[in-house]
């Protein structure tokens, strides 16, 4: 018997799970709504709520913790991308940087009054190929 087993396991290695959740979390913050399977969404909800709680603190330490959890990599631009940057603003080429800024500037301020439960999961029809339960996970409006 495996009592109190809280690990997220969907048939992948732990490093793959960690990277997959970080990428899904970045997509959720960027688009505020993604479609995925139900087990992934339930695990993603736990991490998303923790990130919003960090964003509500809005401190440098919280920002550094969020960068670590999101596995943000600040990549250097190629010379072509640097030339194409309008007005020298190179941040548009690094989505990870935009995600962290959106998390702390928009989402953190949106949920200041709310104590928890920042996301909702809406169930969809099962996927045709493998009958997996699909769902939409999204941030609440306010």
Curated annotation (Swiss-Prot):
GO terms for molecular function: structural constituent of ribosome. Coiled coil: none annotated. GO terms for biological process: translation. InterPro entries: Ribosomal_bL17 (IPR000456), Ribosomal_bL17_CS (IPR047859), Ribosomal_bL17_sf (IPR036373). Pfam families: Ribosomal_L17 (PF01196). Keywords: Ribonucleoprotein, Ribosomal protein. GO terms for cellular component: cytosolic large ribosomal subunit. HAMAP family: Ribosomal_bL17. Part of the 50S ribosomal subunit. Contacts protein L32. PANTHER family: LARGE RIBOSOMAL SUBUNIT PROTEIN BL17M, RIBOSOMAL PROTEIN L17. Belongs to the bacterial ribosomal protein bL17 family. This is Large ribosomal subunit protein bL17. The gene is rplQ.
